[in-house]
Amino acid sequence: ETLPHAMVTTNLAITHYLRGAFAPASRLLMDTITIGQTGSLMANTLSAIYLKAHLLRAQGALRMALKLCQDGLRLVEQRGWHDAPAAGFLYVALGDLLGELNDLSAAAEYLERGIDLGHEGGDPHIVIAGHVRLSWLRHRQGDVRGSHEAIRAALDLVERDAGSRFWPLPPADCYQARLWIAHGNLAAASRWAEVTHRARGDHPITYLHEAEDLTIARLLIAQGDPGAAETLLHGLLTAARSDGRYGSLIEMLTLQALAFAAQHRDDEALSALAEALELAEPEGFVRTFLDEGAPIAELLRSAVVHDRHASYALQLLKAFDESAATEQPLPEPLSDRELEVLRLVAAGYSNQAIANELFLAVSTVKKHINHVYAKLAVTSRTQAVARGRELGLV
C-alpha cells in the first residue's frame, strides 16, 4: 500500500470518528494498522493505534484498547521505532489508559515521553493530547501547579495551531473547565459554558460535542441545578446507548447517579450507579468513578450496603482510600467574596481600595484576605496571587 492511500484511509477514518460513526472508523483504522507496519507508513500506523485505542475506550473495551497499545509497543521495539516522534501517539494512548486504571506513576511516564517525542517531531497533535491528559493526571495527584502548567501548554498550542481543531484530540477547554469546577471556580466555568453555548447555538446531541455536554452537566450539578443536569444527561444517555458507546455510558451513568442523589432520589441514584458498575467491572474502570470525588464514594458505600455489585464497589472504595493517602489535598474552595478580594489583590488594589470598591470595612477586607491565605496555604499577597493563577482563579 502506498503512503497516499494510507493517509486517505486515516483521514476518512477520522471523519467517521468525529461523526461518532465508530464501525466504519474502526474498520478503516484496523486496515491502516494491519498494512502500515513498514517504515514509510510508521506515522500512519501509530496514529491509527492512538485513534483506535481511544475509540475502543469510548466503546467500553478498556482491556482491548490496552492490548492494542501493548501490541503496538512490541511493534515499536521490533521495528526500532521507540525513539521516533510518531511513537509519541502510542505513549500518550498508553498514558491515558493506565491513568484510567489508576496506575498514575506509569501513566505519567508514558505521557511525558509522548510529549517529548511530539516536541522533537514538531507534531502539535501529540503534544496537545499529551498535555491535556497530563493536566488531568496531575490534578488526580493533587499537583495543582503541574496541572495548571500542562493545561496552559495545551491551550496555548491549540490557539497557535488551527489545524488541531480538525483532529480527534481531548478538548483542552473542557478540561480547563473541569479543573475550574474541581477547584470551586464556578464563575470561570460558567463563563466558559456561556461562550461555548453561543458558539454552538442550538444543536442536536452528537459525539463531537459530548465532552462539552458532560462538562456542562458537571457544572450544573456543582451549581445546584441537578434537574437541568439530569435533562441534559437523558439525551446523552439515549445517544450513547444507541451508538454502543459503553465507555461514555459509564461516565454518563455516574453523573446521572450524582444528579439523582443531589435531588434525594436515592433509589434512582443507586440504580444508575449499579448499571455503571455492571458495565465497568469487566473492564476495570477506576478513575471514571474516583474523579467524581466524595459524592460518588458515598453512593458506592450505599451500593455495598444494598449489595449492588458490592465486590467492585468495595474495590473502588479501597482505591479511594489509597488515593486519599497519597495525593496532595486540593485547597478548600474560596467563597464568591473571597474570589472578588483575591482578584482585586491581583489587580494591585490596596486594602483601602478594595474596601472602597466592595463597600466594605477595611477590617472586613483583612478578614477575607486572611481566609484566602488560609485556604490557599500561603502567607503573603504575592504567594496568594501566584497560587490563584495556578488554580485559574485570577
Protein language model annotation of sequence segments:
Residues P4-A21, N44-A61, A86-N102, I126-G142, ...:
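Tandem amphipathic alpha-helical repeat scaffolds
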Residues R191, E298-R337:
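Intrinsically disordered or compositionally simple regulatory linkers and C-terminal tails
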Residues D267-F285, A294, D307, D321:
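TPR/TPR-like (Sel1-like) alpha-helical repeat modules
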